[in-house]
Amino acid sequence: GSCRMSQRGAPSTSPIIPSLSPSSGGNPSPRSSQRIDSVRVPARLPGGSDHPEYGLPLSPRSLRPYLSRGPGAFCAPPWRPDVNRLAGDVNRLFRGISTSSIHVTEDSRVLRRVLLDFYAMGYTHARPTLECWQALLQLMPEQSLPLRATLRAINSEDKYEQRFLDPPSKPPKTLFGEECEVSGDESPSEEEEASGNSTISEFSPEEESASSDFESFSDEEDDSCCTGKWSSSESDSEADVPTNPPTTRARAAQKRRGRPVPKGGRPAKSARR
């Protein structure tokens, strides 16, 4: 009978070894639901010289231990798109954000942005180097072996036919992305909080001793001097206006009211009250 030859450059797998690769389109393959520990190394991996993105070719023997355990055991050649699996994986991440994140809305936006960024990088041929892949996915060199083998297998295909994928045929029953849209969850991020706190001026005893005008307050003065409110008059913009924010002035007034009267001195009106 006729013998059907495999496509040039495509990795061939043993017929008795299941594959981690999902089927094309929206319908998952029965093999795609198998556990990762049942995945085995393809019988032949694409050859070729050293490449900036996935490095030197890997032998099946060196790749085998990393396909079933460790942080890098999330992919294996050959790869095919599976919309159902992708929708389920993204929904699991939304579930983690909705149940444990402090900034739910912000983190859900980050997840959507990451998905778009990786698609856009591939579409625009902005290909990460091997070191960049390891930094982005936080993988050690030995943990990135399955990723390297998968990328080499993808790039060994002669060409890919452009097509549009349909929505998942089996979407998750509970969409946790909808639960991430929490009203009022627009709190600033940690970076914004850190930058905002740097502008707050704290009162210190040195500032109090250096400001002699704090000791000359009386009831005849304007209330704005004691309440810490800024005045719009031009006279206040000169010597009477403190160099620190108004909250510092209010704290100084509170501390001054609780001080004991010096010996031989006459207490102020505010202290006598």
From Swiss-Prot:
Keywords: Early protein
Region span, Disordered: 1-57, 160-273
Keyword hit for Membrane: no
Bias kind Low complexity: ranges: 11-33, 261-273
Name assigned to this protein: Transcriptional regulator ICP22 homolog
Acidic residues compositional bias, start-end: 178-194, 204-224
UniProt record, GO biological process: regulation of gene expression
Similarity remark: Belongs to the herpesviridae ICP22 family.
